[in-house]
Amino acid sequence: ALPISAQAEQILTWTDGAPNRGTRVEATIWLGDQLAERTDGALKIDYHWGGALMNFKAATKGIGSGAADMGLMVGAYNPTLHPGYLLADLPMPYSDPWVGNRAIYDLVQNNADLQAEFHKLNLQYITNITTTQIELICKDKTVKSLEDIKGLKVRGTGVYMKVFGDLGSTPVNMSSAEAYQGISTGLLDCTQIYGYAIPAFKLEEVANEVTKLDWGALMGMAFVMNKDVYDALPEDQKKTLNQLGSDFIDHYAEKIMAGNAKAYENIAAGKDGNKVNISDLPDAEKAKLVEASAPYIDEWRAAAKASGLDADGIYDQYIALLKKYDDERKAKGYPWR
């Protein structure tokens, strides 16, 4: 065998629907830097941002068919392809980003049904990302209880928007990028959002009340690799990639949680001249939010069972993993501290 330094370098094309900016993108580039470093330059990633190769909807089949070697796959764009994995997008009683992302990573790596779901698409699951907890930012409206949501025009995502609708809000369908204009023109009272995304979309310029719901997160977003490309890698490179996928969970959580903390610090202090009040939804109200999500968990179970998955087994394993990592966090703190 040739010494490692003499192995031909392999360039892996990466498709990403998102523009090249922000914490998640920085962490994605870290993954590529680490892969090159840990394989002594044998594996390198060539990134294509902003949907330049293919958009988010096309990425799942595109990576599976070899139009790209790797990339970010967002489950919500193709729900029928990922009935099991979409459990990751549902509200859970645990909202810590490290806990959630570590649990879903472990679940996919160790659950035969979920492995098969990815393999059927000719994809190898590498690692996972999370939006972090869903919070609420409003203009001139303070939300102290779920009662206060009634009648408010709110933009949201997936099941989280549906639950708000069930609780009496008026759901408004628009993207998070349109929320700024929606709030400034009065089409919206509030938008569901993640901490780091508030300054990213400059929402503190048009809204002044944040209620921390700390409610679930969207985690049905995976870094995947074409399975044929993965299978053709030498064993040592597979091992390196698998270890890196696990290390990424910690690295990403550390960076994204720091991004959230900094965003809140800046908007609370009015760093850019726009001060925002930040309050927490009381625990009893948070519990009601989780309760209101139950019908959608049942809906997920039915869809997963219909596609031949052991839905109860997947769900129970996921809850057990969430509890395991939450207990670990409480006992030992985060791995990077």
Name what the model sees in each region.
Residues 8-101, 113-337:
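N-terminal secretory/targeting leader peptides
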